[in-house]
Amino acid sequence: MEQRKKFRLADVVLSVICVVFVAEAAAPVASIGNSQYFWWVFMMIAFLLPYGMISSELGTTYTGDGGLYDWINKAFPRSKWGARASWYYWINFPLWMASLAVVCPELLSVLTGLQFGWFAKLLIELAFIWTVTWIAFYPVCDSIIILNISAAIKMILALTVGVLGIVYVVKNGFVNDMAFRTFLPGLDLHSLSYISVIIFNFLGFEVVCTYADNMRDPKRQIPQAIVSGGIVIALIYLFSAFGIGAAIPTHEISEDSGLIDAVSLMTGRTSGLFVGAVALLFLITLFGNMISWSMGVNSTAAYAAENGDMPAIFARRWAKNDMPIGSALTSGIVASVVCILGIIIELLSPDSSLFWSFFALKLVMLLLSYAPVFPAFLRLREIDPDSERPFRVPGGRGMLRVLAYVPMALILISIFFTAVPLSMDSETLSGYLPITIGSILSIVIGEILIAARARRHHS
């Protein structure tokens, strides 16, 4: 019975696609115009390739539930960076869950033709959050079918957008200026602030490493899945990016519902069977995103709590199956509070972009959690050279430093341009300040909780 629930290689590859490929992040990137193609290719080479190799080495050398927390903690055991990374990694999840919950009422409006009031919106958002939370109470191997279906749907949606873009161009031509200069990298604040979304679109390989106990042969399956899944993901991103960029005027792309807008503009319909089917499939992928990430995030938080680096509630496990329900419940509560605040903000300021505000805040916190992984990789090579490494990043010391520090620098730069307002005009401040203030509050709360937990753990 247990053997039947083990992941096959195909399951692991589809899990990589389900975790890493994020359909809802395509629209913000497409909004920067044709320069997105330069950034996609550049980030594939400068970030995806080294990050994928480093994750493969660390994930196959140090298997277990701890994920990136375990790697950082092993590399720097006397510092708080493991605890900080686990906090940043965890807090990103309820923020992300809230940002996706905000999209659900709009998708249901497309499906049903109904317009929801604020109370109905809140109920829909809470239903999404607590459905995901309930599913997180069970092992990820019990959700193989959901993950596989979600991965398949994501690929279908991306290919559909790409094909529709080609059809639109054949019939009507390109809607955006396709001059060579438009493909050069944009260095304006608008473009640079979305680079973090491209990096986010490549994150998540370490989540699959926390599935090791559910795999038949993790030391072989993890690197195989990361390589094959990474190639598929890169190709799908480029194809779907072309579809959106070719058929939709850049200024008309919505950050909140870009995929649905893309299909509507390409087909010339805002409703109907086809658009409704796309909305339904997109909704299913949102559940797939949350379910696939919940295992990695909750396991990492529980592992850190058991080591005394996170609040004790995160260490609570369900006696029935040993799942980290404390972390899952806390995520559900925090996401619910964020959605309630979002409803209040929407009532006070109807034009606010809640999805992007919540999504950008989660981006900052998630990227912060990854920054220490790269120096941890170098440190573990130095202090633990004798551990068996089923997959080993090729190259000498100099090359390894380049492979580690370039993606780390890209992460830090993208955090800066996402969270720090570089202009004091009212429009810039209204867009950036919620992200800046939210990031500072999240960091400060984390420091307080980590310090309090450390005192209790050592007393």
Each model region followed by its residue ranges:
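Membrane-interface "cap" regions at the ends of multi-pass membrane proteins
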Residues: 1-42, 48-53, 64, 74, ...
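Select transmembrane alpha-helical segments in multipass membrane proteins
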Residues: 5-16, 38, 78-92, 124-128, ...
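Helix-loop-helix junctions that connect adjacent transmembrane segments
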Residues: 3, 35-38, 115, 120, ...
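Membrane-interface loop-to-helix entry segments
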Residues: 119-172, 203, 226-230, 363-372, ...
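A generic transmembrane alpha-helix motif of multi-pass inner-membrane proteins
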Residues: 40, 168-169, 357, 361-369, ...
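TM-loop-TM module centered on a large, flexible mid-protein loop between adjacent transmembrane helices
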Residues: 70-78, 110-114, 225-291, 310-362
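C-terminal membrane-solvent junction of multi-pass transporters and transport-like membrane proteins
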Residues: 3, 313-322, 367-420
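Hydrophobic transmembrane alpha-helices that form the core helical bundles
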Residues: 30-31, 50-129, 134-137, 283-300, ...
